């Protein structure tokens, strides 16, 4: 058994924090800090790395950051890493309307965690992907785009927390991080 490691997860999203703690809780102790880190424009990987670098500089130590993308196949991957801004501007119905003139409503959810050991260090990425389709909102509306992303017949919002934490893009990324931690890579 590895000694308990503490990770400082940079987030102000209590739902993300709860999922991370539920999935990593037996391997690592999660502290959380809400700091504003300006996000660059770029690929999900570029955004995740830069966010981790900037957070490590601000904190002065090791950090874990997370970025999520939701890409619509019909729109060649848009809104992608900018889903948060699209959702804020358009809402669930607006995101659905973007696809109304297309037959293809398939989407890919991508979660990228970036771990940075500290200022000046290169972040390490852990990424998970889940395929699904975009549907009219179903289930509770309190966690981002969960009500419109359907995987295996249920939206993320319709799934109980345990089920979502077994199939989600976030779970898949965290499983890779968890394995890395269990392998003793983090001193």
From Swiss-Prot:
A Pfam entry, by short name: Ham1p_like
NCBIfam families from the UniProt entry: RdgB/HAM1 family non-canonical purine NTP pyrophosphatase (TIGR00042)
Quaternary structure annotation from Swiss-Prot or TrEMBL: Homodimer.
Keyword Nucleotide-binding applies: yes
Names of required cofactors: Mg(2+); Mn(2+)
Class of the enzyme per the UniProt entry, highest EC level: hydrolase
Regions crossing the membrane: none
The keyword Zinc-finger appears for this protein: no
Protein name per Swiss-Prot or TrEMBL: Inosine triphosphate pyrophosphatase
Family label: Belongs to the HAM1 NTPase family.
Keywords, sorted A to Z: Cytoplasm, Hydrolase, Magnesium, Manganese, Metal-binding, Nucleotide metabolism, Nucleotide-binding, Nucleus
GO biological process: deoxyribonucleoside triphosphate catabolic process; nucleoside triphosphate catabolic process; nucleotide metabolic process
Family annotation (InterPro entries): ITPase, ITPase-like_fam, RdgB/HAM1
Localization in the cell: Cytoplasm; Nucleus
Cofactor note text: Binds 1 divalent metal cation per subunit; can use either Mg(2+) or Mn(2+).
Binding site for ITP: 11-16, 51, 67-68, 84, 143-146, 164, 169-170
Domain of life: Eukaryota
Functional note: Pyrophosphatase that hydrolyzes non-canonical purine nucleotides such as inosine triphosphate (ITP), deoxyinosine triphosphate (dITP) or xanthosine 5'-triphosphate (XTP) to their respective monophosphate derivatives. The enzyme does not distinguish between the deoxy- and ribose forms. Probably excludes non-canonical purines from RNA and DNA precursor pools, thus preventing their incorporation into RNA and DNA and avoiding chromosomal lesions.
Predominant location category: cytoplasm
GO CC, one annotated term: cytoplasm
């Amino acid at each position: 058994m590895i000694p308990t490691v503490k990770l400082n997860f940079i987030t102000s999203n209590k739902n993300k924090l709860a999922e991370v703690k539920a999935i990593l809780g037996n391997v690592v102790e999660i502290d959380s800090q809400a700091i504003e880190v300006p996000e660059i424009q770029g690929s999900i990987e570029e955004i995740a790395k830069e966010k981790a670098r900037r957070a490590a500089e601000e904190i002065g130590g090791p950090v874990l950051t997370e970025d999520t993308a939701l890409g619509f196949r019909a729109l060649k991957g848009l809104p992608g890493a900018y889903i948060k801004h699209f959702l804020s501007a358009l809402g669930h119905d607006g995101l659905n309307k973007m696809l109304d003139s297309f037959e293809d409503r398939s989407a890919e959810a991508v979660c990228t965690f970036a771990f940075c050991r500290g200022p000046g260090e290169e972040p390490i990425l852990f990424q998970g992907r889940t395929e699904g389709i975009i549907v009219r909102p179903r289930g509770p509306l309190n966690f981002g785009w969960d009500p419109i992303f359907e995987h295996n017949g249920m939206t993320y919002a319709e799934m109980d927390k345990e089920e979502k934490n077994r199939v989600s893009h976030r779970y898949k990324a965290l499983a890779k991080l968890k394995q890395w931690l269990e392998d003793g890579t983090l001193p």
